[in-house]
From Swiss-Prot:
CDD domains: Sarcolamban
Function: Plays an essential role in the regulation of calcium transport at the sarcoplasmic reticulum (SR), which is secondarily required for regular muscle contraction.
Identification of the protein by name: Sarcolamban A
Organism whose genome encodes this protein: Drosophila melanogaster
Disruption phenotype: SclA and SclB double mutants show arrhythmic cardiac contractions and correspondingly, cardiac cells show irregular action potentials (APs), involving double and occasionally failed APs. Calcium transients in these mutants show higher amplitudes and steeper decay than those in wild type flies.
Predominant location category: membrane
Membrane protein topology class: Single-pass membrane protein
Transmembrane segments: 7-27
One cellular component (GO) term of this entry: T-tubule
Amino acid sequence: MSEARNLFTTFGILAILLFFLYLIYAVL
């Protein structure tokens, strides 16, 4: 269970980073 939760957290962080990159690209 801990492994799945850790993987989900990592995926969430990656999604946030991609979202910020998209925002920066949209502003530029």
